[in-house]
Amino acid sequence: MIGIDIVSIARIEKCVKRFEMRFLERFLSPSEIVLCKDKSSSIAGFFALKEACSKALQVGIGKELSFLDMRISKSPKNAPLITLSKEKMDYFNIQSLSASISHDAGFAIAVVMVSSSNL
């Protein structure tokens, strides 16, 4: 399955200014916050990536999958990598996850492809 999401970078900037760390901690782990380096475009991209993953799994963010069940890191070539907690990888019977993030014209867009025998 494939999931896609697009986010306004300005909307994310407003949330960060208004709620500061409380906003970030709702959907990012401490290591993900460090990876974003306070860049609104990176924060928006990470938000979009987690939303895209939830859509690829056909559950959205909620009871079956929370933002913090997903972890974003970077490859040695700085490409985004996404994984889920072991519990969720098993729950969804995920074999692999592939991800891409792009930013342009004030928006961040992300795509996730999930390989699973359940989907």
Curated annotation (Swiss-Prot):
Main location: cytoplasm
Source organism superkingdom: Bacteria
Signal peptide: none
Chemical reaction(s) catalysed: apo-[ACP] + CoA = holo-[ACP] + adenosine 3',5'-bisphosphate + H(+)
A molecular-function term among this protein's GO annotations: magnesium ion binding
Pfam family, one: ACPS
Cofactor: Mg(2+)
Localization of this protein: Cytoplasm
Keyword terms, alphabetized: Cytoplasm, Fatty acid biosynthesis, Fatty acid metabolism, Lipid biosynthesis, Lipid metabolism, Magnesium, Metal-binding, Transferase
Record flagged with keyword Magnesium: yes
Family: Belongs to the P-Pant transferase superfamily. AcpS family.
NCBIfam families: acpS, pantethn_trn
Protein name: Holo-[acyl-carrier-protein] synthase
Species for this entry: Helicobacter pylori (strain J99 / ATCC 700824)
Gene name of the encoded protein: acpS
